[in-house]
Amino acid sequence: MTHTGSCLCGAVTFEVEGELNPPDACHCSQCRKQSGHIWASTDVPRDRLTIAGEDRLSWYQSSPKVRRGFCSVCGSFLFWDPPARGSIAIDMGAFDAPTGTHLHLHIFTADKGDYYEIGDGVPQK
């Protein structure tokens, strides 16, 4: 099974081979500021990810151990990349078709915005 996706303008595209891991929803202040709200993503082993349009992919070093990838044309936030790890997180909203996954965890909930509640019954950390 291959999952495909892209940024809003299509300048950056990607393919993931195989099944996707269940996504989590990050409520940290960095993800909220970059995405505009919570950020749902799935962790994918690097060797199963192919990115096209890398010349349009910009990286922002958001902390000493993590960089965030976004399209330099449309600004879509696509990737959360801890280079020392064997996986990279991909934005769930960037996939072209339904993924068949279900949210399995809310993370950094202590940092969540005060304008919403989490009431879906999914575990929180």
Model regions and ranges:
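A short Gly-Trp-Pro
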Residues: 1-125
